Amino acid sequence: MVECVKGRPNVLAIVLAGGEGKRLFPLTEDRAKPAVPFGGTYRLIDFVLSNLVNAGYLKIAVLTQYKSHSLDRHISVSWNVSGPTGQYIASVPAQQRLGKRWFTGSADAILQSLNLISDEKPDYVIVFGADHVYRMDPSQMVDEHIKSGKSVSVAGIRVPRHEATAFGCIQSDDEGNITEFLEKPADPPGTPDDPDVTFASMGNYVFTTEALVRALKDDSENEDSEHDMGGDIIPYFVDRGDAHVYDFSRNIVPGATERDKGYWRDVGTIDAFYECHMDLISVHPIFNLYNKEWPIHTTVEGNLPPAKFVQGGIAQSSMVAPGSIISAGTVRNSVLSTDVIVEEGATVEGAVLMPGVRIGKGAVVRHAILDKNVVVRDGELIGVDHDRDSQRFKVSAGGVVTVGKNQVV
């Protein structure tokens, strides 16, 4: 972690964590999207918070709203950095400071939380999303933002042009000035150096504070606005020639490998969430969780013992979290969270198992995501018969079977 250095610009980080995550249902049925477990021991929000903390930013407000109990608890338990130093990572629910209403959009969430900015009086405000899987040193983006002289910088990642229709797309000139910002266009623009590649917005922004406050207040008076950061606030600055694109490919993270440099995934769908897990488990993973120079921080609750393999139980090309027991069962190409039990004769292949899952004797689970505390009875088959699975569970376009929290099947 980078130490806070005297003379660095005063920065407040705001993490937007109020999203409902409808496309991840049923994983988001009882929790906010940033609270969804990921990678065996983490939650999605751990990635953005780790990036900020590793870069030395320790004044972080996490704006929450939708079913935030588990998210609030995770932040208070795993991210408690408060003390006499003035540092904090705080969960901030909707305050209704501007009337009896909840957040109506991401920009409105910050507008209703302007007291955080007035209290801290930062020079710059980082506004990052809470539900992406990646490593990034935000301080490099802040430094480039300051040099640009613009009021906002938008982090952009290069994606194939044909895939960019799912993102906010950035068109810029040779100097990095954003000339156009298009929300999910049918015909995405190319970059100045490659017409087959598009800058897609990562949903990460750095603002000069005064300009952000002015834009939020102007937006609040616009009856036609949806009060969205990407849809309304960023175009506000682009129209004024006051926006800069930060090329994520230039971000250098200590300890990154050539394979995972520039890795960023939007895990907003079941298929994307599943595939991102599969990126973790190869010998040379596409995304390496074992980078000690830029760790992903979290706290594993329960003081769990190490994973145990007994009676010939095996796990191949898999990640198995503490507290799990593989007893005469077989696990392949899977990610098992904490406190998972796989019993005699059971087979788990290409699966993501959340905390507390139980796989009964002789059961088979393939190409599936099982949410927290799911119990699979002895001899049950999941991911084997598509028609039967479709009648009982959600099956994604990519064929991933998802079983909701606490079900006994």
Curated annotation (Swiss-Prot):
SUPFAM superfamilies: Nucleotide-diphospho-sugar transferases (SSF53448), Trimeric LpxA-like enzymes (SSF51161). The keyword Membrane does not apply. Gene3D superfamilies: Hexapeptide repeat proteins, Spore Coat Polysaccharide Biosynthesis Protein SpsA, Chain A. GO terms for molecular function: ATP binding; glucose-1-phosphate adenylyltransferase activity. InterPro entries: ADP-Glc_PPase, ADP_Glu_pyroP_CS, GlgC_bac, GlmU/GlgC-like_hexapep, NTP_transferase_dom, Nucleotide-diphossugar_trans, Trimer_LpxA-like_sf. Its EC number is 2.7.7.27. Pathway: Glycan biosynthesis; glycogen biosynthesis. This is Glucose-1-phosphate adenylyltransferase. It is an enzyme of class 2 (transferase). Transmembrane segments: none annotated.
